[in-house]
Amino acid sequence: MSDLSKYRNIGIFAHVDAGKTTTTERILKLTGQIHKTGEVHDGESTTDFMEQEAERGITIQSAAVSCFWKDHRFNVIDTPGHVDFTVEVYRSLKVLDGGIGVFCGSGGVEPQSETNWRYANDSEVARIIFVNKLDRIGADFLNVVDQIKNVLGAVPLVMTLPIGREDDFVGVVDILSRQAYVWDDTGLPENYEITDIPADMVDDVEAYREELIETALEQDDDLLEAYMEGEMPTDEQVKMCIRRGTRDCSFFPTYCGSAFKNKGMQLILDAVVDYLPSPTEVDPQPLTDPETGEPTGEVATVSVDAPLKALAFKIMDDRFGALTFIRIYAGKLNKGDTILNSATGKTERIGRMVEMQADQRNELSSAQAGDIIAVVGMKNVKTGHTLCDVKHECTLEAMIFPTPVISIAVTPKDKGGSEKMGIAIGKMVAEDPSFLVHTDEETGETILKGMGELHLDIKVDILKRTYGVDLIVGAPQVAYRETITKPVEDSYTHKKQSGGSGQFGKIDYIMKPGEVGSGFKFTSSVVGGNVPKEFWPAIEKGFKGMMDTGVLAGFPVLDVEIELLDGGFHAVDSSAVAFEIAAKGAFRQSMPKAGAQLLEPIMAVDVFTPEDHVGDVIGDLNRRRGMIKDQMAGVTGSRIKADVPLSEMFGYIGHLRTMTSGRGQFSMEFAHYAPCPVNVAATVIEEVKALNAKK
């Protein structure tokens, strides 16, 4: 039985190209899990094992690896940095207890680092900070520390200082122990010596040490009071306070180094052991009502002796077969056990269990609370499903994923590809909850929906190369929505007579705008028996069913409230079907009267540009109907934040690179829906009508 206090379930988060995957490679090298470190730029990293990852030099999936350091077990997840794959970051945060935020020593706090940091804050995940790439030209550790304070609003607790800058970066000073770690030029992580602090750094180290101790001791009033009276705490007492403050996110221990040059990595591994929480030191996962999704007040207390409670957080189909990644919160899981999937009510028998080393597998006979493992061949499990003891059914808090904002139509080039594509897409949808698919019934086209251009580009590439489906790909389409802007009181009668019993249903109602994000809401204030209560659910069903297809251009409808006021029925001809049809007709009749309006998705765009191109970038965003929200000057350039309609952002990366001579970067994520300008709405509606006319 493993000691849970020696478990560390951690994620590595950062902006694209800040060095997350290289950091993971160095961790695996130092912990003895790999003997030759693979490099991202060579396409050989252990955690980037998809073809598309190796080629593009980015992480697309979150890959789980296990390793050991100083008798502690690390389960490490290397997550994507590109905003189109943020869902991977989100679901990783759901099952982690701590994290390492990696920042580039020259790039500082970049757009996606800010997004990931916000997600980690929302999940209350304890973190340490690693400022990487200090061997690069322009790297400035203390400048990045200032950005972390000013941009993220975080409190970085500086634990190490760099010795030398850029090409002359040779090592780090451990501030608490007052020791210098200096590496030689071989690039080997073990080739270092511990020496005295360089003479020209002594004063700085003492100043930072005093600040470190004062900040840490704020976690313990007695130690702080003694310190103020002149009594120095021991290093162990300071570490205890740092651990406490890190666990509750009061501050974030901050380290510097170069993962690529193997400098400073041992101190980061020590920090994971010393300061990040074990599974028993984080708030337990809440249990929810399976019907309503509301918390029950009970929690999944982390204990090996409790009944099984586990969460399936990722499905992956690789060359070995279907894998279900699960985090075990309570209990034990043995090969051959029969467990319950509380989402489906069906049981599953555990066949093979494996511990992952990226795309390598180690067979397991058992696992316990605190473990992150993969189970081979589960049939009916999806991301977010709870797996539990058959005699102790429970449901863990659900995983909520963002709604796709962009779509493309794809068709196989030959008829034989249809079945192959269907099988492939089924697997891909199971793997990625932010990737949705449906078939256009009129055209027969398959519509792929995703989080951005790169997201869908990768999916098409996987279909073509991994599954061998040759495709015709249409232009990207925006996920518009419709809504109403004013209340309308109306009446509708459905009457049909065709011999024998007919159909009759009359409803009087108010259709009015709902609160933003409220979706559909139905209430009834009918008094008396003019519309018997037994027909109310059918009326609600009819209205709600029409929310999928608006009257302007057939887009889904947002935020509508219906209040049923009165109506009429016929003793023979009225039925649930008649009233459902009446509600559908009422929706079509009243939505135009209620000021139907087209909505477009607005993206929160974060652009980095060299200073001499700021004017061009802002002017271009304005031409794209963007609203500038913020502009921040940095050492290497400026960051511009703007809200821009998605329809104006297709192909933006190429245009930005042209404007900035290849030096500009940007990220964007869905912000909200907003009314389309009249001229834009008219164009969109005409385009939809023209497209429908061709069908």
Curated annotation (Swiss-Prot):
<dbReference type="InterPro" id="IPR027417">
    <property type="entry name" value="P-loop_NTPase"/>
</dbReference>
<dbReference type="Pfam" id="PF00679">
    <property type="entry name" value="EFG_C"/>
</dbReference>
<keyword id="KW-0547">Nucleotide-binding</keyword>
<dbReference type="GO" id="GO:0003924">
    <property type="term" value="F:GTPase activity"/>
</dbReference>
<dbReference type="InterPro" id="IPR041095">
    <property type="entry name" value="EFG_II"/>
</dbReference>
<dbReference type="GO" id="GO:0097216">
    <property type="term" value="F:guanosine tetraphosphate binding"/>
</dbReference>
<feature type="binding site">
    <location>
        <begin position="78"/>
        <end position="82"/>
    </location>
    <ligand>
        <name>GTP</name>
    </ligand>
</feature>
<dbReference type="InterPro" id="IPR031157">
    <property type="entry name" value="G_TR_CS"/>
</dbReference>
<dbReference type="InterPro" id="IPR009022">
    <property type="entry name" value="EFG_III"/>
</dbReference>
<dbReference type="InterPro" id="IPR035647">
    <property type="entry name" value="EFG_III/V"/>
</dbReference>
<keyword id="KW-0963">Cytoplasm</keyword>
<dbReference type="InterPro" id="IPR014721">
    <property type="entry name" value="Ribsml_uS5_D2-typ_fold_subgr"/>
</dbReference>
<feature type="domain" description="tr-type G">
    <location>
        <begin position="5"/>
        <end position="280"/>
    </location>
</feature>
<comment type="similarity">
    <text>Belongs to the TRAFAC class translation factor GTPase superfamily. Classic translation factor GTPase family. EF-G/EF-2 subfamily.</text>
</comment>
<dbReference type="GO" id="GO:0005737">
    <property type="term" value="C:cytoplasm"/>
</dbReference>
<dbReference type="InterPro" id="IPR020568">
    <property type="entry name" value="Ribosomal_Su5_D2-typ_SF"/>
</dbReference>
<comment type="function">
    <text>Catalyzes the GTP-dependent ribosomal translocation step during translation elongation. During this step, the ribosome changes from the pre-translocational (PRE) to the post-translocational (POST) state as the newly formed A-site-bound peptidyl-tRNA and P-site-bound deacylated tRNA move to the P and E sites, respectively. Catalyzes the coordinated movement of the two tRNA molecules, the mRNA and conformational changes in the ribosome.</text>
</comment>
<dbReference type="GO" id="GO:0032790">
    <property type="term" value="P:ribosome disassembly"/>
</dbReference>
<dbReference type="InterPro" id="IPR047872">
    <property type="entry name" value="EFG_IV"/>
</dbReference>
<dbReference type="GO" id="GO:0005525">
    <property type="term" value="F:GTP binding"/>
</dbReference>
<dbReference type="Pfam" id="PF00009">
    <property type="entry name" value="GTP_EFTU"/>
</dbReference>
<keyword id="KW-0342">GTP-binding</keyword>
<dbReference type="InterPro" id="IPR004540">
    <property type="entry name" value="Transl_elong_EFG/EF2"/>
</dbReference>
<keyword id="KW-0251">Elongation factor</keyword>
<dbReference type="Pfam" id="PF03144">
    <property type="entry name" value="GTP_EFTU_D2"/>
</dbReference>
<keyword id="KW-0648">Protein biosynthesis</keyword>
<dbReference type="InterPro" id="IPR005225">
    <property type="entry name" value="Small_GTP-bd"/>
</dbReference>
<dbReference type="InterPro" id="IPR035649">
    <property type="entry name" value="EFG_V"/>
</dbReference>
<feature type="binding site">
    <location>
        <begin position="14"/>
        <end position="21"/>
    </location>
    <ligand>
        <name>GTP</name>
    </ligand>
</feature>
<dbReference type="InterPro" id="IPR004161">
    <property type="entry name" value="EFTu-like_2"/>
</dbReference>
<feature type="binding site">
    <location>
        <begin position="132"/>
        <end position="135"/>
    </location>
    <ligand>
        <name>GTP</name>
    </ligand>
</feature>
<dbReference type="InterPro" id="IPR000640">
    <property type="entry name" value="EFG_V-like"/>
</dbReference>
<dbReference type="InterPro" id="IPR009000">
    <property type="entry name" value="Transl_B-barrel_sf"/>
</dbReference>
<dbReference type="Pfam" id="PF14492">
    <property type="entry name" value="EFG_III"/>
</dbReference>
<dbReference type="GO" id="GO:0003746">
    <property type="term" value="F:translation elongation factor activity"/>
</dbReference>
<dbReference type="InterPro" id="IPR005517">
    <property type="entry name" value="Transl_elong_EFG/EF2_IV"/>
</dbReference>
<protein>
    <recommendedName>
        <fullName>Elongation factor G 2</fullName>
    </recommendedName>
</protein>
<dbReference type="InterPro" id="IPR000795">
    <property type="entry name" value="T_Tr_GTP-bd_dom"/>
</dbReference>
<dbReference type="Pfam" id="PF03764">
    <property type="entry name" value="EFG_IV"/>
</dbReference>
